[in-house]
């Protein structure tokens, strides 16, 4: 019996880990047990073993920069120290030249392969601002991918343009958008979102816009912000 097997058999989450090694995905109750367990090291060992079995020892990463094009926002999320209301003395919106300069610096110094573009919900920015930015980046820096705009930003643009979010996504893709980040999800439980980000889109709209992204051939991800008012059940 290997040392890993012995550790699994003596762990309070051993049954879940053993199932995972055998290709059986955890159920919802299992996820809650994993979240509440302090056997983090063993989880890491098992996760590493599964990863090596599937992909070998190859790893990858994306060398990128985060470009916050504006901090103007009308959403007032409780956890955000970044945003400033419209006309605030510390508010800003980058010009096309400023965006180009930042991407150029990233390319010249670090040979970035991607720029993550995110900002506030600025009601003064129409879709042309984003289209011009994406087209400029893709034309002047063809080796730099455009990974941009949370679902809530996309919804904001649709509101400004009086258009559908799918139409906005389609136009942004045509302009050079290549993938959509997972921001804006926080915790996909509306009772939590109503406390920390009541002016943002709800969970159903977040999921809907992500589905629209996939339908248009735009890969997307999901992020989770935890450690505030959520419970473990909300996370699971």
Placement of each model-derived feature along the sequence:
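Short capping/connector residues at structural and topological boundaries
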Residues: 39, 66, 72, 78, ...
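N-terminal pre-triad scaffold of radical SAM enzymes
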Residues: 44-87, 91-118
């Amino acid at each position: 019996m290997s040392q890993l097997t012995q550790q699994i058999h003596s762990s309070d989450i051993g049954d879940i880990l053993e199932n995972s090694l055998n290709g059986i995905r955890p159920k919802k109750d299992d996820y809650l047990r994993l979240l509440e367990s302090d056997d983090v090291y063993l989880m890491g060992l098992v996760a590493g073993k599964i990863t090596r079995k599937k992909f070998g020892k190859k790893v990858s990463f994306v060398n990128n920069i985060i470009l916050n094009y504006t901090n103007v926002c009308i959403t007032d999320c409780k956890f955000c120290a970044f945003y400033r209301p419209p006309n605030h003395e510390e508010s800003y919106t980058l010009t096309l030249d400023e965006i180009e300069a930042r991407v150029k610096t990233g390319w010249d110094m670090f040979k970035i392969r991607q720029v993550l573009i995110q900002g506030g919900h600025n009601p003064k920015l129409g879709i042309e601002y984003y289209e011009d930015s994406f087209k400029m980046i893709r034309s002047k820096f063809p080796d730099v991918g455009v990974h941009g705009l949370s679902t809530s930003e996309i919804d904001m643009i649709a509101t400004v343009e009086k258009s559908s979010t799918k139409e906005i996504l389609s136009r942004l893709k045509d302009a050079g958008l290549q993938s959509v980040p997972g921001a804006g999800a926080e915790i996909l439980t509306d009772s939590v979102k109503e406390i920390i980000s009541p002016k943002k889109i709800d969970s159903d709209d977040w999921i809907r816009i992500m589905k629209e992204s996939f339908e248009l051939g735009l890969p997307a991800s999901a992020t989770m912000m935890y450690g505030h008012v959520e419970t473990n059940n909300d996370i699971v």
